[in-house]
Amino acid sequence: DKHVKAWNEISKILRGKEITLEELHTKLNGTPNIQNILYFTDGKATKEELEKYSQKKEEYYRQFCKEDTEKFHLVDGVCEFFDHLKEKDIPFTIASASIKENIDFFIESFGLDRWIKPEDIVYDDGTYENKIAMFHKAADVIGIDMKDIRIYEDSNSGIRNAYDAGCEQIVVICDKENEEEFLKRPGVIEVMQDFSFAKEL
């Protein structure tokens, strides 16, 4: 995962060692950059350092994406799924722990503005306390009550935050061998590997 590789680089710079698998799953996945940098520095990073290393992490991430031409693409079936939602007038948006530079990069790379107005995408602009607040903002953007929203997630912390935000319909994108484990999680109603089902809609 390119985010992991990027955080590894930042971890090596800030504390001279790579991140552990446990840290990745319990502390870093799906959390805002600033929170992760504070974790690496035991809360000692200055405002300037938070900004600097947040930007640097995303520079690493975009660099790794560009280098991996084979795997840098949307999940199978996502385009058809977005087309279906638009066709049926079902409101949707993206809530991402990425910063604006990354969102701009994704919009440009994948043409996301075909389906979603860029200003409707919720991202880490430094004003959100956590991903829960971002989910609430996304619900406001599409004008739907959280209990009626379906959230698609692929990270442990994202699943937990979606549930804590009040979502009762969480769909997890995961490897086949992890399906059983994720189905036991609160709020999870479905698991899948991709959106290929949308090609039949």
Go through the PLM ranges and name each one.
Residues 96-98:
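Conserved phosphate-coupling serine/threonine residues in phosphotransfer and NTP-handling enzymes
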